[in-house]
Amino acid sequence: MAASGTTTKNVPSWKVSGDWFDVCKCNMPCPCEFAQAPTYGDCAGVLAWHIKKGQYSDTVLDGLNVLGLGSFTGNIWAGEAKDATFGFFIDEKANEQQRQALQMIFSGKAGGFTAEFAKLVGDIRGIEFAPIKFELADDLSYWTAEIPGKVLAKAEALTGPMTPPGKRVQTINPHKT
């Protein structure tokens, strides 16, 4: 994950980089990653972000986590999504300035990639603060994101017949910001 943005003179420059994973009810690999319709016509999933390095103006965001829960019907990337809703959980470790910054970034109000994503979703149901556990295997073989008692999302890396032992299938977005 690497994203940044600037919108108006009232919104400071920002940049975050780290890990972004998602899991949903669709077949693997997720059709959304390739701008295709959901496997069963609708999607319900969890997006997890771990910010390794980030800033919003002078506010440091390093080490914080954000989880998003969303659902929609139709191909979201083709502009055909209906009933698209999304809600966020922001790491309770964040102080007040960090909370405000993360709300601006992930609601899309700070511009950049997340603003484009927010346009696709339309209905953001709310933002809550919660303890978020995020775990990623060093070899990328699995990841887990959890809000105890509320959300558990976990996945294992894709492998295939042509994947060398110990290596993982990865989709890389070459876009640089």
Predicted regions and their residues:
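N-terminal ordered "arm"
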Residues: 8-56
